[in-house]
Amino acid sequence: MKVKLDENLPLRIAIELRARSHDVQTVREEGLTGRADADIWQASQHEGRILITQDLDFSDSRKFQPGTHHGIVVIRLRSPSRQNLIARANKLFDTEDVSGWGAVLSW
């Protein structure tokens, strides 16, 4: 699966997803840190990637209508520690096949 990991998530998630044979690019590794959401979104869609983020700006399903993109996963936790974020991302990929969702998911 092709994934773009936003800058607000630990790089460890990328490492663990790559170990599961996912094609992961990160905002940090691509030099997009600090860029506007529109730039991150455009890069993600141009590359055909699901965007994984904590940024609530991407959770608006009116702006990001299901079926019009490759997918968005917005991870929201009460306690968003590094360890908890990694655990949630791992759980998502352990329990769901998010390829082809084309929807916004707050998880």
State where each predicted segment sits:
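Short glycine-/acidic-enriched loop or helix-start segments at secondary-structure transitions
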Residues: A14-I15, S61-K63, N84
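N-terminal first-folded block
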Residues: K2-I50
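Short beta->alpha connector loops at strand-helix junctions that form conserved
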Residues: R28, D55, I75-L77
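Solvent-exposed interaction patches of small proteins and small membrane subunits
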Residues: R20-H22, D39, K63, I72, ...
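C-terminal structural segments of small proteins and small subunits
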Residues: H69-W107
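Acidic, metal-binding active-site segment of PIN/NYN-like and related structure-specific nucleases
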Residues: Q45-K63
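Glycine-rich nucleotide phosphate-binding loop and flanking beta-alpha elements
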Residues: L11, F58-D60, S81
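Short, hinge-like loop/turn segments at secondary-structure boundaries
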Residues: Q42-S44, T68-G71
